[in-house]
Amino acid sequence: MAENVKRKKKKRAVLIVLMALVLAVLAVVCVYETELNKLDSNDGVDNSFYDSQFKNKKVMVIVPHEDDDLLISGQVLPPMYKNGADVRVVFATNGDKRVSAYTRQSEACNALEKLGIPREKVIFLGYPDGTQLYVGKKAYSFSSGRDHTYAGKGFKDYHFDRFGTHAKYTAENMVDDIESVVLEYRPDYILAIDFDTHTDHRGVSISFEKAMERILKKESGYTPKVLKCFGYSLAWKSKPDFYALNIKSTVMQDREKNNDPSYETDVPQYRWNNRVRLPIDKKSLSHSILRCSEYKALSQHLSQYAYCYSERIINGDSVYWNRRTDSLTYNADISVSSGDASLLNDFRLIGVGNRTAGPNVKLENCVSRFDKNDAQKTVTVKFDSPKTVSCVSLYDNFGLNSNILGGVITFNDGSKVEVPALNADGSETRVVFEPKHNITSFTFKVTEYEGVAGLDEIEAFENADYDMGFSLIKLKNADTDDYIYNYLITPDEKSLNLGAYASDPNAGYTIKIIEGDSVKLEGNTLVFDDDFEKCTVRAELNGDPSTYDQITVKRLSERELKSYESFEKVNKTVFKIDTLRLKMKNLFVNGYVYEELNDFVKSLEKKAGIEISE
């Protein structure tokens, strides 16, 4: 009897201890969530960008792999869709080099569903992963052995779904299918992967641009807005800077990591200051990485460990380069006194030779070079009907030692425009003049050069300025260039220099404080008194108050700052624990237990200098 009583008391004591532990954990979680809710308060934060500008617009994302969509559009596509855009996400390959197509495609659909985008908005072209298909080499799927497009169980590849047959794995067929899917849906906006250091990113980028060349030359009335983005340098391999007092914007990759360190980006003609910066929906932001919608989506890509790179991928903006599609030269007849005229209106800024894989790929098949002995060095552009022209854009041979130093444009009406030295890095040199009407042809003649004179592209526009189809203003920290949302300052900060990014670089804007005490605006600088706590600041485009951005600025006390620093340590720990959980889940869900154990054993062998496995 006495023994039973003792056992019951022990059980009761154990239960009490367990309940106390559970309550303690719940209390910690409640405190954590309360503090996080305070930090994440977006009351007063607002931007007009996603409200209605994409309603009834068609937006298409074109990427190589199932997860690349999150790298280039994961933070902007969901708010577009939620605000009325008709979206399509096109995956060019099955991502099936080491993992089955079914696994990759299931992960992609699950991830997009986490962002509110349904499965029926997803298209799989079904081409192989990790091959040299793009340069004409024979290709097959590493995981399935197939030599034609296919999809995993329960999915269909685009070519079979559209035409009833699978397409052979050839470069030409991939270009055909990209062209077909674009013309079938005719998107208003295309967000496409750009040429970076990944072989499939390079190949799909070039394939897309070849498809766009065909479209622009045969569909003169269809000129979608094209925004291109680097998936590796600006996301997957970017700086892991999520854990900061305020969210950081995308940073330029260190030059030594580029395909050619001579240039700012992997595409020589892109300048960092010319990038298009789209803001992030405030609802997707959090000081906890686990709360960010992008992380929740990345967590669905178990096989790729994509979630491990969230610190690099999640930023305060999404960065693109605009590629104009309205050039009059796409439907013009172009001839040259020497060189290859076909390269001058092909939409492609760069090309490759016999490989897309490996570091420092040689860029070729993109510049039309004049013969050294050619005394004329002239390009002639003839239109099929009279045009109005107000701008000619010239892209120099991007070899830094080969530059056109001067030239002249002569129009069929006899008028001439002098051309200064072109940008040596091959970036766009815009020659703008008063509109010339009834132009049927013009020539560009090189008058001075060094090295090998040549051109990458020649474009002509009716309107010098380009309308992106949307209006945007976004406040930023003028000193760091980071976009601002709910901004926290430390106790000793006395001022904050504000700037703004506008979709129209020529647009003026007005900044004003709409709420808050003990703060004043001196020019574009917020000046805080010692007793400042919080304010709300609004920026509006001059003449268009419907285009606005609104931010909050809050000062942390010394206690709050210390609390925040402790909070961030907890956040980092929670992130590490969750990534470990997801790695373990991947081992069992995708059946990688043996492979992981084998890799672990091999790592031990390498360290010990012995061989115990086969």
Q: What spans do the regions from the language model cover?
A:
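Active-site beta-strand->loop->alpha-helix modules in alpha/beta enzyme cores, enriched
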Residues: 13-20, 26-221
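Extracellular/luminal low-complexity segments enriched in Ser/Thr/Pro
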Residues: 524-531
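Extracellular interdomain linker/stem segments of modular secreted and single-pass surface proteins
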Residues: 464-465, 554-561
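Short, exposed coil/turn segments at beta-strand boundaries within extracellular/luminal domains
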Residues: 450-452, 541-549
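The feature marks non-catalytic terminal segments
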Residues: 19-33, 45-51, 107, 111-115, ...
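Aromatic, loop-rich ligand-recognition surfaces of beta-strand-rich domains
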Residues: 357-416, 423-467
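N-terminal Lys/Arg-rich, disordered targeting/topogenic segments
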Residues: 1-12
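Solvent-exposed, low-complexity, repeat-rich "mucin-like" stalks and linkers
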Residues: 469-507, 569
